[in-house]
Amino acid sequence: MRPEDTNDTSGESTDRPIRAVLFDFHGTLAQVEPLRLSVEWAAHVCGVTLGEYRSTVLADALGALGWVGSGQPAKVLPSFAAAWADRDLSEQSHQEAFVGLASGTSGAFEGFADAMYERLCAPETWIAYADTVPTLRALRDRGVPLALVSNIGFDVRPVLKHLEIDDLFDHTILSYEVGWAKPEPAIFLDACIRLGVEPGDALMVGDSMADAAAIDLGIRTLLVPHTEPGERVGIDAVTRLVHRPRA
């Protein structure tokens, strides 16, 4: 789906005003830094010297396993499959899942997996897309209620603060805190209730089929493509879709 398009299966006309917006986080508002930079950071904290070539090789190997930001599906092994299934519902499972994934990196040095997980959760690892802050501020200035709805297993609020967008959301709903993860209907309904709108009056903005499950509740949904950190992802289209709230 292009950023200019939305799907509306609510049974209502698409002219029905959108009065609140739900945003996914990773892949929608921000992306992790280039993987080679994270690998170099991990090497530094582990006291390992890597040349540019080896850093690139390790980054490519980890990306091929489906590390965050790679755009590749995760290659989940039986040794951490249970943790992977629960990664968005438990901090412990989230850590176990991603450390397990990184542990399979060919040529990794001692301490690599733990260091990569530490870097993943660090606020400075995350880079907002070029249109994230302008879009959120424009919606906020127009009085549009906003909620962050994220499948995640660690507290992303310090990341939001680092990106200077923490004060732009009325509610921050994290799957591991509420006990529901997208595509479960409950997490979308929870967001709508908190924002004080009916599902048919809301827009979900995300980058995955889990986000698109909001359509089943009558929430119009905008999906954006995989985009490199710092580039324009296309969420600025939201400002053209949302009606000004009634006075």
Ranges and model annotations:
Residues 1-23, 47-53, 108-111, 133, ...:
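Asp-based, Mg2+/Mn2+-dependent phosphohydrolase catalytic module
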Residues 15-130, 142:
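N-terminal helical cap/lid subdomain that shapes the substrate entry/recognition surface
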